[in-house]
């Protein structure tokens, strides 16, 4: 479903070049909940942007649904990205608009018929259990409710891939657990493949079946969650395990 092969990405910064990705490869299969974990600056967000077609690698390939993103025309890329939902850390919602309007926005931009918009928004509102907040302004919601709105918005185009960028890092532990349960429900009941990035080992342990550990732009370890965290090889992986055992957040 998602194949990233030997990708490299370098950015030019104020203090010289930053090697954001160095020979990075990951394989995400249909039905996976695949976690990318690493500390700040590890390259996680850059990798996610490659998968979403927002960045192009300097070398290597990014395949989604057996299509090389680098070879697609703009119209083809837009069509493919319609099947990729995105959930953000800071929600990226319009506070001055209602829950309904925020969720409907992707369909409004596509100029979908009003009855189609109404039906789809109500459907995803039921799924994320926010039916009673339909006409509420986003500014009046809690952090957890805002993230549910963000998830519902991502589901309006019926994606088969969901990319989550630190989707729970701004939430308290109890709310984090409820959002992770929702993501697991989306994976199980809708058959959506999920690729998430995080710096919290507990998030990966709770819902992921596979994980890749990143450090300094490289994947230093990958495999099943049980194998990687049960028998950590890389120093950074061992550090995550140690922090988790102490009950803290990496």
Segments (PLM) and residue ranges:
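Helix-to-loop junction immediately C-terminal to a conserved catalytic motif
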Residues: 52
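Conserved ABC ATPase "signature" region
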Residues: 68, 108, 115-132
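Conserved ABC ATPase signature
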Residues: 137-141, 145
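A short, proline-enriched helix->beta-strand linker immediately N-terminal to the Walker B motif
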Residues: 156-160
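A short, surface-exposed alpha-helical micro-motif characterized by mixed small hydrophobic
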Residues: 204-206
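ABC ATPase "signature
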Residues: 222-223
């Amino acid at each position: 479903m998602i194949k990233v092969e030997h990708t490299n990405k370098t950015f030019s910064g104020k203090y010289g070049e930053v090697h954001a990705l160095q020979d990075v490869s990951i394989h995400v299969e249909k039905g996976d909940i695949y976690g990318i974990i690493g500390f700040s600056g590890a390259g996680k967000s850059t990798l996610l942007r490659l998968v979403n077609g927002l960045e192009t690698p300097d070398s290597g390939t990014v395949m989604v649904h057996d299509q090389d993103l680098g070879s697609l025309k703009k119209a083809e890329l837009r069509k493919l990205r319609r099947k990729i939902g995105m959930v953000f850390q800071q929600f990226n919602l319009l506070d001055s608009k209602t829950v309904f309007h925020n969720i409907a926005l992707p369909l409004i931009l596509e100029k979908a018929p009003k009855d189609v918009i109404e039906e789809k928004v109500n459907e995803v509102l039921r799924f994320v259990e926010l039916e009673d907040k339909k006409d509420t302004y986003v500014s009046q919601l809690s952090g957890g409710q805002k993230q549910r709105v963000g998830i519902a918005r991502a589901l309006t185009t019926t994606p088969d891939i969901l990319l989550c960028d630190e989707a729970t890092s701004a939430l308290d532990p109890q709310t984090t657990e409820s959002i992770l349960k929702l993501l697991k429900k989306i994976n199980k009941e809708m058959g959506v493949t999920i690729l998430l990035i995080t710096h919290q080992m507990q998030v990966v342990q709770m819902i992921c079946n596979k994980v890749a550990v990143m450090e300094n732009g490289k994947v230093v370890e990958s495999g099943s969650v049980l194998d990687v965290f049960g028998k950590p090889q890389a120093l950074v992986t061992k550090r995550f395990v140690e922090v988790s055992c102490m009950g803290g957040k990496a």
